[in-house]
């Protein structure tokens, strides 16, 4: 939530909502081509073989042909890597990878940053794989320079970023102006900056991103003209702004018609300890108590699925919103996620104030939310903000903390939203449960249902989790959430949080666990 400016089941999951993976293809056998080796003890006058390796990543990138693999031996490479060549569908990708299990480290210590620049930087590239590296220590202390761990930009297809460890990418400058801008960095950034040509068929999987100093930017972001992607099985933690962000309407694409991330899957990720409270881009007096950083955020994206993720100990667990007036986040499905212990709220939707955009035609289904709103601010488990239209909120478990706030919606710009088949529970019992809907407060579960017309089939009961002290929010066999949901196969998905088949009884369970 920028208040200042700014898993393996991929194909099947997307097919459920008719969101295609486009041309994402199964592996193809290619004809033999030349592979290359890089070592800290090598020389760029060598042949690039295992016995006579190159010294620099860049030289290997300059000579690699479609289908080549560049094997990087263990060691520290204080170098940038600029990738402008491409693999091909016929010959295969160009792959950059560590050699066997050796620790190949790309270290930015002392390297300059020019504009927005990745220490690994892909421009208009196609059929490229970057995997198995540790990428670290790329920093700037200068306003309006943006260091990035891996930066993919322009247009391109079939880009895979896998199993990299990215940390200590930082901008430590002092933000400027009334909107506190100019302090920005990313761990991974994919910017579709052309039109109509997009960046498409992007796979970002198995990476770890941590200890990032981001200012008003994000840990892992897709922005602009990006179409067809998967962000799966990543671990993102201990950063000072948003974990995963899908963005539209920021002007990254030269055409407004294409300036929106779309047709993607965010699944199987674990995002935790994400907070803006010590980030001066949200207020220079630290801690600023902004509580504005989402674990997972969709800001103007569309036609995508957020499923089977864990988001906890962040400012906000998951948010689907639009920061731009007159624009909307649309057709996003948030399902089968575990969201717990977040400071402001569990799931938020709608513009964060009445100068923002809207959330339209989205689904929030089969999620488990447990004791979010840990700061006691009253945003509750589900925070329904400005301008929400025609959304579905069903089959979720909402367990409140000490405030007993379940849903908080202070705006009257709320129309066509369907809320039903949810399970609620809180320490004060049904009579003390607090709800705000269309700026009307209701104390008590019965008063809320009769006053709003919501949740005719909802329950107020202890969901009987396995072990909350161990954050195990699976259901005991005696849970009232078992078989108590609404079985709408068009939206509930094929798998639960653990990858087990949905609907094993008479009806779907309420919550993330089947």
Where are these regions (language model features)?
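Right-handed parallel beta-helix
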Residues: 93, 99-103, 126-137, 157-170, ...
């Amino acid at each position: 939530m920028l208040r200042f400016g700014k898993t393996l089941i991929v194909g099947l999951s997307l097919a459920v909502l008719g969101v295609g993976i486009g041309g994402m293809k199964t592996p193809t056998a290619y004809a033999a081509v030349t592979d290359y080796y890089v070592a800290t003890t090598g020389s760029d006058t060598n042949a690039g073989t295992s016995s006579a390796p190159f010294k620099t990543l860049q030289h290997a990138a300059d000579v690699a042909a479609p289908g080549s693999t560049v094997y990087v031996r263990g060691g520290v490479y204080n170098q940038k890597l600029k990738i402008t060549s491409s693999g091909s569908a016929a010959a295969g990708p160009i792959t950059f990878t560590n050699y066997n299990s050796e620790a190949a480290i790309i270290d930015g210590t002392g390297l300059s940053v020019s504009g927005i620049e990745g220490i690994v930087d892909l421009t208009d590239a196609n059929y490229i794989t970057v995997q198995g590296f540790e990428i670290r220590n790329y920093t700037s202390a200068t306003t309006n320079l943006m260091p990035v761990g891996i930066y993919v930009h322009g247009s391109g297809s079939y880009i895979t970023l896998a199993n990299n460890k990215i940390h200590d990418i930082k901008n430590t400058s002092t933000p400027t102006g009334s909107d506190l801008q100019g302090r920005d960095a990313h761990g991974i950034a994919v910017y579709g900056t052309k039109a109509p040509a997009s960046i498409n068929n992007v796979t970002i999987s198995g990476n770890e991103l941590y200890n990032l100093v981001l200012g008003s930017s994000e840990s892992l972001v897709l922005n602009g003209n990006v179409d067809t992607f998967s962000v799966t099985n990543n671990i993102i933690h201990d950063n000072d702004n948003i974990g995963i962000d899908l963005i539209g309407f920021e002007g990254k694409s030269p055409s407004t018609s294409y300036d929106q991330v779309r047709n993607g899957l965010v699944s199987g990720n674990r995002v935790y300890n994400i907070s803006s409270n010590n980030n001066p881009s949200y207020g220079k007096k630290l801690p600023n108590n902004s509580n504005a950083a989402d674990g997972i955020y969709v800001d103007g994206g569309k036609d995508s699925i957020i499923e089977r993720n864990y988001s906890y100990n962040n400012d906000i667990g998951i948010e689907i919103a639009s920061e731009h007036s007159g624009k909307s986040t649309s057709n996003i499905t948030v399902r089968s996620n575990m969201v717990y212990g977040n400071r402001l709220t569990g799931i938020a939707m709608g513009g964060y104030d009445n100068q923002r955009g809207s959330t339209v035609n989205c689904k929030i289904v089969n999620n488990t939310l447990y004791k979010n709103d840990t700061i006691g601010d009253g945003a509750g488990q589900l925070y329904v903000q400005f301008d929400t239209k025609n959304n579905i909120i069903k089959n979720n478990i909402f367990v409140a903390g000490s405030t007993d706030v379940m849903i908080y919606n202070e705006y009257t710009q709320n129309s066509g939203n369907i809320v039903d088949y949810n399970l609620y529970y809180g320490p004060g019992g049904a009579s003390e449960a607090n709800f705000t809907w269309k700026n009307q407060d209701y104390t008590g579960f019965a008063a809320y249902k009769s006053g709003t017309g919501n949740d005719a089939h909802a329950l107020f009961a202890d969901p009987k989790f396995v072990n909350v002290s161990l954050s195990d929010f699976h259901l005991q066999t005696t849970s009232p959430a078992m078989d108590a949901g609404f079985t709408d196969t068009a939206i509930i998905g094929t798998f639960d949080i653990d990858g087990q088949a949905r609907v094993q009884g008479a009806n779907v369970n309420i919550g993330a666990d089947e």
